[in-house]
A protein has these predicted regions:
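Basic- and aromatic-enriched surface patches that contact anionic nucleotides/nucleic acids
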Residues: 1-25, 29-234
Length: 234
């Protein structure tokens, strides 16, 4: 999925009005279960503003542990917990961690102690593991790289110098790589849309299940929405 490549490349950040990351361990496990069973994982709404919009003013500074290298191209209006979870799942042993004081309570609980979500070829299951365990006596692979051969195979080649890896383990991993690559997610991209267009899309597409009001959205982006209508009273 292109959106996952954009996450890995640091091209997407949550909208500034979004509440902090709130998923806990069971939510992460359910997310990866849906992917591995090839069930739909919901929808994502991304705004790619036109050149008149200062992305740094309407977006946050990072998605999970990933900070953009340069100006991000997209603002996540809906689906930030799913994409932030995938971003956290990309972490490799030894990768730098954000300052813990900058993480939400849920991020500190789930990821702050250098936990990774992994595919364990020995136990044949997906689970949480401390990053030190990933470099132990069995092949344990961070979940976020199983679909990307440019990251997966260098990791496997490195581990082959340290441990024995069976063909069955590789076959087991390959199944999950295919599942991630075929993940069913509806992605709507508002390409070069104005802030007013983004607000309109938010009202009509992301109304159900979005944990903020239209007024929250309008307030967060008011600097760029001088001509936008006020949010209706309820």
């Amino acid at each position: 999925m292109d959106v996952l490549r954009d996450v890995a490349a640091g091209k997407l950040v949550p909208a500034s009005f979004q509440r902090p990351y709130v998923w806990r361990g069971p939510d992460v496990e359910a997310f990866w279960t849906s992917i591995t069973k090839e069930w739909p994982i919901g929808s994502i709404l991304i705004w790619e503003p036109d050149a008149s919009v200062d992305v740094s003013r309407v977006g946050r500074t990072r998605l999970g542990p990933i900070e953009p290298a340069g100006e991000p191209k997209g603002i996540i209006l809906d689906g930030q917990n799913r994409l932030a979870t995938f971003a956290w799942s990309l972490r490799m042993p030894g990768d730098p961690m954000p300052d813990l004081s900058l993480l939400s309570e849920a991020e500190r609980e789930v990821w702050g102690s250098k936990q990774l979500f992994v595919f364990d070829t020995h136990e044949r299951r997906a689970r949480f593991a401390h990053e030190d365990e990933v470099m132990g006596e069995h092949l344990i692979v961070p979940a976020g790289i199983v679909h990307d051969s440019t990251k997966l195979w260098p990791f496997i080649r490195k581990r082959e110098k340290q441990i024995d890896i069976s063909d069955e383990a590789i076959t087991w991993l390959d199944h999950f790589g295919k599942a991630v690559r075929s993940a069913q997610c509806t992605t709507t991209i508002l390409d070069r849309a104005s802030p007013a267009d983004a607000l309109d899309a938010f009202r009509h597409i992301a109304r159900v299940g979005v944990p903020m009001s239209e007024q929250d959205f309008a307030d967060a982006m008011a600097w760029a929405l001088e001509d936008a209508p006020a949010a209706p009273s309820l």
